[in-house]
């Protein structure tokens, strides 16, 4: 029964080291080829979600490693050791021999793995989690490797193949594969950091623009301002997650470097024979650890910047609320004054009107009222003056709106004219206007033809 091929998940891609200048050859997804020739070197990429694959595929790995595939963890590293009378080496788990569906791992094989957690944030509401993992099986006698890589897209797979250590390094030091894997992972952490930085910077620049005088805010802009605080707190949550994952990544690299030192301490004679490879691998791991520490420090600084942005906006909001309360208080006072004025204004107007020289009360004889014949002059002056006052106020109040509307219409007209001229130029194909045509036109033997653009 072709048990291995039947249980292979659909997202598996197998590459075998053929030793020629091409290096690695694609072998499809038939896991039988790996079990038939365990002395060869294989790199197996698993791109599909491991939880969606057949559960028997997970039984190929150690029980301690299976939670790395199943669970949502933020980082992991482990390495098993074996020993003999003469040396110590990283070895495979003893249970790897007992399961009938596992690769047969001898007692001189290393099984180690490292796992990282990355959150890629495009916007405050659009983000995704990644959990890239590498599982290395290394034979201490032959130096052959079977490497499983989980969670890499095709571009990252290509980069990983290009960044692989040399065959000599892989043969004598399995940690060199972890160093190459960590290099790509730290680049993903760096990309994730800059995505977050762009989000924070966007809101900082938006606040700077808000200080400038501008037109009346649209309904969409007011709705955006209403949602700004939930968005800022979503970004803060993403920053907390990034800081957590990068700290765990730094610790994972520290443990990896420590395990490399333990191996040299316990198997110093054999390590000394390939000390150059060991030192180069340790240098690469320490370099990635320093990158992780730098990103962790920058993430803390970015988080402080973002918290300062939130505090500043909250302060502006509080000041705006105070201004709003003061404005409402002033508005209430003005409403009271206007109401009182409205109560007394009719009586004041009537008394003022009858108190003019157009009216005269005569007690004798008979308490009579006399009205001047020129009373019409009052209305002739008052009505135009009132209309003029209202007109001046209207111009003052609506002038900015009118200027904006005129400018908008001019821009629209200019754009339309430019578009028409462009179309007319494209349709026009004028003939050469030579000297002969000039003479004929001057002597009125040829009519002047003009093309007008509307």
UniProtKB/Swiss-Prot annotation:
Ranges for region Disordered: 205-224
InterPro entries xrefs: CorA_TM1_TM2, MgTranspt_CorA/ZnTranspt_ZntB
Membrane topology reported for the UniProt record: Multi-pass membrane protein
Keywords from the named record: Glycoprotein, Membrane, Transmembrane, Transmembrane helix
Record field: transmembrane: 334-354, 375-395
Subcellular location per the Swiss-Prot or TrEMBL entry: Membrane
Descriptive protein name: Notoamide biosynthesis cluster protein M'
């Amino acid at each position: 029964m072709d048990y291995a091929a039947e249980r292979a998940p659909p997202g598996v891609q197998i590459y075998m080291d053929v030793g020629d200048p091409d290096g690695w050859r694609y072998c499809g997804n038939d896991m039988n080829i790996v079990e038939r020739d365990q002395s060869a070197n294989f790199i197996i990429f698993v791109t599909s979600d491991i939880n969606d694959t057949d559960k028997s595929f997970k039984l190929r790995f150690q029980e301690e490693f299976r939670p790395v595939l199943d669970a949502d963890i933020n980082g992991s590293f482990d390495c098993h050791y074996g020993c003999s009378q003469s040396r110590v080496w990283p070895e495979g788990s003893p249970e790897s021999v007992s399961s009938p569906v596992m690769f047969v791992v001898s007692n001189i094989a290393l099984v180690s793995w490292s796992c990282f957690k990355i959150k890629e944030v495009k916007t405050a509401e659009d983000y995704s989690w990644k959990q890239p993992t590498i599982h290395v099986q290394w034979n201490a006698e032959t130096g052959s490797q079977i490497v499983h890589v989980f969670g890499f897209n095709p571009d990252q797979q290509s980069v990983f193949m290009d960044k692989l250590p040399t065959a000599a390094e892989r043969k004598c030091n399995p940690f060199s594969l972890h160093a190459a894997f960590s290099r790509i992972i730290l680049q993903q952490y760096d990309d994730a950091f800059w995505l977050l930085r762009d989000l924070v910077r966007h809101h900082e620049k938006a606040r700077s623009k808000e200080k400038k005088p501008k037109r009346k805010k649209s309904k969409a802009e007011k709705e955006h301002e209403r949602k700004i605080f939930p968005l800022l707190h979503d970004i803060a949550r993403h920053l907390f997650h990034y800081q957590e994952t990068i700290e765990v990544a730094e610790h994972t690299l520290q443990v990896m470097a420590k395990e490399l030192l333990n191996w040299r301490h316990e198997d110093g004679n054999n390590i000394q024979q390939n000390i150059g490879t060991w030192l180069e691998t340790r240098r690469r791991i320490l370099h990635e650890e320093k990158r992780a520490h730098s990103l962790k420090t920058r993430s803390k600084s970015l988080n402080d910047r973002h918290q300062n942005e939130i505090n500043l906006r909250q302060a502006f909001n509080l000041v705006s609320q105070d201004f709003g309360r003061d404005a409402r208080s002033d508005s209430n006072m003005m409403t009271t004054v206007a109401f009182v004025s409205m109560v007394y204004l009719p009586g004041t107007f009537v008394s003022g009107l009858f108190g003019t020289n157009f009216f005269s009360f005569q007690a004798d004889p008979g308490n009579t009222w006399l009205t001047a014949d020129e009373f019409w002059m009052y209305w002739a002056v008052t009505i135009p003056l009132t209309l003029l006052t209202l007109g001046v106020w209207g111009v003052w109040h609506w002038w900015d709106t009118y200027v904006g509307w005129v400018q908008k219409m001019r821009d629209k007209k200019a754009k339309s004219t430019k578009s028409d001229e462009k179309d007319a130029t494209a349709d026009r194909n004028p003939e050469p206007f030579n000297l002969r045509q000039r003479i004929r036109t001057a002597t009125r033997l040829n009519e002047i033809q003009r093309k007008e653009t509307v």
